[in-house]
Structure formats: C-alpha cells, structure tokens
C-alpha cells in the first residue's frame, strides 16, 4: 500500500454480508481510533457497532452501496456492484465528431420548448418541481461512504457508459457544487467528512518517476477501495486511494484542488456557524501547507500563479499554460478565504504578511493588465513595441497584430471581460467563463468590471449561452490553430468539451455572481433555459455544437456536478441571502493599498532587498 493509507478493517465472519453502517441523513460522526502501524502507515478503525438492518423499499443505487430510505446498507463485503435496472436512452454524437457543415445545419434546427423530443416525435414536458426532486435523488445516489459516513460524491453515475475510466472517483473540484448543495440543504456531515479526510490525503507521499511535488498538494481525486487485509483473508480493509495526477490522463497536476478545498472550508464555516473545524490544528496546518506551496519564491516576475496546461477544470491541452485566469481567480479567492480563517499566532506572522502582499499585487495585476473592453482593444491596436523602459506603456511587448479578427466585431460597446492569459508577447483573448465569474465572486474584479462582465454575458447571450448554459470558453479553436494547440485532440474538437462546449455545472457560478451584483434575473433566465432539456437529456456532462444543440459526443450522463450545479442555482435563487457564504467583499485595507499602487511611480524600487524569513508550517 501507499504511504499513510487510511484503512478500515472489517472481520468477514463477524457481520453478515449486508452491513448497516450509517445513515446519511442523521447527524452522526463515526468514532475513529488511530493506531500507528508503521512509520508511513496509519490505520483508522470504525468503532461503531455493525448490525444487520431491515430496510424499506425505495432503494437508490450507487457504485458501491445502496441507500434504502434513510438507511445505508454496504455491499462492499460482497465484492459486488449493483447493476442499475433502469435502461437509459440517450442521444449521442458519432464518436468521430461532426463536420463544421453538419454542425452549422444542426444549429439551425429548432429545439422544443419546455421539453425534449421523444422517439415518436412528441414533446415531453417535465415540471420544475419534479426536476428538482429528481436531481436530489440522483445527487444522493452518487454519495460515496467510508467508515459508515458519507465522504463525497462520484463524478458520474452513467449506467450506459462502457468505460468507467475515473468517473467513479470523488474529484475535489467536482464535489464543490455537491458540497455547497448539501450545505444549503442543511446536511453538513458529508462536507465536514470530505474536508477532514481529504486533509489526511494531503500528507501522503506523492511520487511519479522518482520525483515528488510539493507536500501541500491536494489530490485530484480519490476512491474508496475494499481489499483483503495483508496476511489475513478473513479480514478486509477499506482504503482511500488518492490520485495526485500520477494516473490522470496526461499526468496533469491538480493545482486547483487545494484552492477549492480552502474555498469550501470557508463556506462550511460560514454556512454552519461551526468554526471548530477550521480552527483545528491539523486544518490550520493544511491551509498553511497549501499557501506555502502557492507563495513559494520562484523565477516569475508576475504575482500570478505559473502553472502548466491542464491544471484546472480544463484538464487537457488547450493552450492555457502560463497564467490562466481560472487559476488566478481561484488563487485570489483562496488567499482571501485563508486570510479570514488563519488563527493569529507568532509562527503565522510572516505567512500572513506574504499573503497580504500577494493579494494586493495580484489584485492590481489582474485588474490592470487582464481587463479588456472596446477602449482597451483600441489602446492595444495603437501600441508601440520594443519599449525598453521602466515606465513603458506596452509592458509585455504585445504586438497589435495579435488582436484576432473575430474580436473586433464581437466586443460590444458596453461591457468587457478579463482575458484568459497573459505572458510576455502573448495575450489570450478568449473568454473563459469560470475565471470571469469567480473574479466577480471573489472581488478580484472591481465593482465596475464585475457589472461590465455581466453586461458582456447579456450582450453575447446568443453566443455564450445559446440553447444550454454555459460555454466554458469562447470562441472555439478550429483548423490549424486547433491542430497545433491541442495536438489534434479528438475530444476537444471545435465546439466540443473544453473547446467551446457548454457545461451546465457553470450555472451555479453564474448564479452566485449574478446575485452578488444584484442581478439575479440573469441566472433565472439561464436556469429556466436549462430546465427545458437537462433532465430529459439525462443530466449530461457537457453539450456540443456552437449553439449547444447536442449532448456531447463523449459526455457522461448523470454527471454529478451538472446535477449539483443546477441544485445550487435553484437553492440560491430561492434564498439569495445564502450567496454571502460563497462571496467575498473587498475590504478597505486592500482597497487603500490598491489605490496607492495606482498612484505610485511605476518605476520599481531598486537596491538590496531584505532577506525574507522562511514560512514555518
């Protein structure tokens, strides 16, 4: 086993094959006893009694368990998985994708309103209430249990899929909307367990090809496995098996996992009022380890976080390596959340000072250099290049010819957005939805910029939302650009998956941003649009074509974060005040520091620099 594995030992002969472990709906936390087994291994015993339970009807199936009424019955001891009895019908694209001509023709086909076309051509209608009920049932079916307690939700529960890959695992980023949905519903245990168990995984040894990344790295995903106990066939052990990118397609590093973990931790405290979790010594240490990894000194001259391609929601090669907006927005949000939660102590003074300095610099950098509107495009169009000066206007030596032809006519007179990436001599002018929305939520964007982003989305509704919210980025790369940048990725063909596909899970971020800015009608319109199809389409992972007419050619059905994203949007629209659990407001200290930077001489301070003290974690 890997180092520091977390184990539950269950004697096979001591209980029947169907063991009542825990109830998901009862606020109960298992009693766990820690017993060191070896230097790099730790055992977790569940001391709750195991008893056979009589169960009522109405069972829900998941990948390794059955939820019956309000009781959970484990089927792990049988080494079996339940087959889903209901056959699912779906409309999928050919595996080789669609030609551009066919996509254009299909985009002109009308879609039914308030329903989807069935096999006999008749429209089927599903009420809003029934959609929510179905979504909650599906979300609870996706719950994964460990030590008798809910610990997360699997990525997808698609019974039609012939290849599971890693969709049966609990992904950190995928669980965020699920966790928020449970928090807003008043079901807190699953989020608390998720936070604490993933924290244990942070300290695991992570090695790929003899190289180990930083200690604070959070896993991309994990899976609950049941294996025979070494040396004792009469015992089994439940093992948390994490993936830090060693097994992921492309071996991508999950940079966003730790950032999302901090954001969820803060949301848990805000929503429950229980600050005891974030004040725990091990949780405080986990926060500091993530910050230490993110704030480490490097060669970069920018305050933004330098990452490789595929390090966030867009986890395939899409030309976002460098300083992608999504990572910067999550980074800023995590810094703000950590600033609230870190307990004051002597050992944290230097870390908090570095955190505050980075917040101010990052805020200034994104607002000044990532912002794009019609005025800024005209400014770039007139840029002088090859400027060698401390007060150069074109600091990053951006060539005006980089302005893409589509952008000139696409940018509305009113509104703007934050570009996708910025590096020396390179600006990625694509609109990335998650990065822009989370910049609003976290106050990385200014108040005026936040309203302008929403103005932009409204002005370009037909392109960014079309028939199913919400495009992950716009526009899609096509032709030679697609071949060079994606490496001819067959999954990221134009207007599919990460390359301009529509992702329903983004509904919840749009809702939080809209409510924060006092414009909930934007989210209401998007949710109403999604309700026309998403249930009858079996909750797909993403949609294809320019107007999102088809279920994605490789999209999983019953994708958990599509389900959870819809539920969070509905819960927040029903109770807009709850959005404050997720948003951050710019405080006066940061605002004053930002104003000072704007008015200061752009020439950098020169001279010897005082040595910084290392962070002690």
Curated annotation (Swiss-Prot):
Q: What is its main location?
A: plastid
Modified residue Phosphoserine is at which positions?
87
Annotated organelle transit peptide span: 1-45
Give compartment(s): Plastid, Chloroplast
Gene Ontology CC: one annotated term:
chloroplast
Indicate whether Chloroplast appears among the record's keywords: yes
Q: In which tissues is it expressed?
A: Expressed in roots, leaves and flowers.
This protein's superkingdom? Eukaryota
Q: What reactions does this protein catalyze?
A: Hydrolysis of terminal non-reducing beta-D-fructofuranoside residues in beta-D-fructofuranosides
Phenotype of gene-disrupted mutants: No visible phenotype under normal growth conditions, but the mutant plants accumulate decreased amount of starch during the day.
List the GO biological process terms: cotyledon development; starch metabolic process; sucrose catabolic process
Gene Ontology terms, MF aspect: endo-alpha-N-acetylgalactosaminidase activity; sucrose alpha-glucosidase activity
The EC number on file is: 3.2.1.26
Q: What class of enzyme is it?
A: hydrolase
| Keyword ATP-binding part of the UniProt annotation | no
Q: Which Pfam families match?
A: Glyco_hydro_100 (PF12899)
Q: Which UniProt keywords apply?
A: Carbohydrate metabolism, Chloroplast, Glycosidase, Hydrolase, Phosphoprotein, Plastid, Transit peptide
Q: Which SUPFAM superfamilies match?
A: Six-hairpin glycosidases (SSF48208)
Record function comment? Chloroplastic invertase that cleaves sucrose into glucose and fructose and is associated with the development of the photosynthetic apparatus and the assimilation of nitrogen in seedlings to control the sucrose to hexose ratio. Participates in the carbon flux between the cytosol and plastids in leaves.
Please give the family membership noted in the entry: Belongs to the glycosyl hydrolase 100 family.
Protein name, per record: Alkaline/neutral invertase E, chloroplastic
């Amino acid at each position: 086993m890997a180092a520091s594995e977390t184990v539950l030992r269950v004697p096979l002969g001591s209980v029947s094959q169907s063991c009542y472990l825990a109830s998901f709906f009862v606020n109960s936390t298992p009693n766990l006893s820690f017993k060191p087994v070896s230097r790099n291994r730790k055992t977790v015993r569940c001391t709750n009694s195991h008893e056979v339970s009589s169960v009522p009807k109405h069972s829900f199936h998941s990948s390794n368990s059955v939820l019956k009424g309000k009781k959970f019955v484990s089927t792990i001891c049988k080494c079996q998985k339940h087959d889903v009895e209901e056959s699912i019908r779906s409309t999928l694209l050919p595996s080789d994708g669609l030609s551009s001509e066919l996509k254009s023709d299909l985009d002109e086909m009308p879609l039914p309103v308030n329903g989807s076309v069935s096999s006999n051509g008749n429209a089927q209608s599903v009420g809003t209430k029934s959609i929510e009920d179905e979504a909650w049932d599906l979300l609870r079916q996706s719950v994964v249990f460990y030590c008798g307690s809910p610990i997360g939700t699997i990525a997808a529960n698609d019974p039609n899929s012939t290849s599971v890959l890693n969709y049966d695992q609990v992904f950190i980023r995928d669980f965020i909307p699920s966790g928020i949905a449970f928090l807003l519903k008043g079901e807190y245990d699953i989020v608390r367990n998720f936070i604490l168990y993933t924290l244990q995984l942070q300290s695991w040894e992570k090695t790929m090809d003899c190289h180990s990344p930083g200690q604070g790295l959070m896993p991309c995903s994990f899976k609950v496995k049941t294996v025979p106990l070494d040396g004792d066939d009469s015992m089994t052990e439940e093992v948390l098996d994490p993936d830090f990118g060693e097994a992921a397609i492309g071996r991508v590093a999950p940079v966003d996992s730790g950032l999302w973990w901090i954001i969820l931790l803060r949301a848990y405290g805000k929503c429950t009022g229980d600050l005891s979790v974030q004040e725990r010594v091990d949780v405080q240490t986990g926060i500091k380890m993530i910050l230490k990894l993110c704030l480490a000194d490097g060669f970069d001259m920018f305050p933004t976080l330098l990452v490789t391609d595929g390090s966030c929601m867009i986890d395939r090669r899409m030309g976002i390596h460098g300083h992608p907006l999504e990572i910067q927005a999550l980074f800023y949000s995590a810094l703000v959340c950590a600033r609230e939660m870190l307990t004051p102590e002597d050992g944290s003074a230097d870390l908090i000072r570095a955190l505050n300095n980075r917040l101010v610099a990052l805020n200034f950098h994104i607002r000044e250099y990532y912002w794009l509107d019609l005025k800024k495009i005209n400014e770039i169009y007139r840029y002088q290049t090859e400027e060698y000066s401390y007060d150069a206007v074109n600091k990053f030596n951006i060539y005006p010819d980089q302005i893409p032809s589509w952008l000139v006519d696409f940018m509305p007179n009113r509104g703007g957005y934050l570009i996708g990436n910025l590096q020396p001599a390179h600006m990625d002018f694509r609109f990335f939805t998650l990065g822009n929305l989370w910049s609003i939520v976290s106050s990385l964007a200014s108040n005026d910029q936040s309203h302008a982003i929403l103005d932009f989305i409204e002005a370009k509704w037909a392109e960014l939302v079309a028939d199913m919210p919400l495009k992950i980025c716009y526009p899609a790369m096509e032709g030679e650009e697609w071949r060079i940048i994606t490496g001819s990725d067959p999954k990221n063909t134009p207007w599919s998956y990460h390359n301009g596909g529509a992702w329903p899970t983004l509904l919840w971020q749009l809702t939080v941003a809209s409510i924060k800015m006092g414009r909930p009608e934007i989210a209401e319109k998007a949710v109403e649009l999604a309700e026309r199809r998403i249930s009858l389409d079996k909750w797909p992972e993403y949609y294809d074509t320019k107007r999102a007419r088809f279920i994605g050619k490789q999209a999983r059905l019953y994708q958990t974060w599509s389900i959870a994203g819809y539920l969070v949007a509905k819960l927040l629209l029903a109770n807009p005040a709850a959005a404050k659990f997720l948003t951050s407001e710019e405080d006066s200290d940061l605002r004053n520091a930002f104003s000072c930077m704007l008015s200061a001489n752009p020439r950098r301070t020169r001279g010897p620099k005082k040595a910084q003290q290392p962070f002690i974690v």
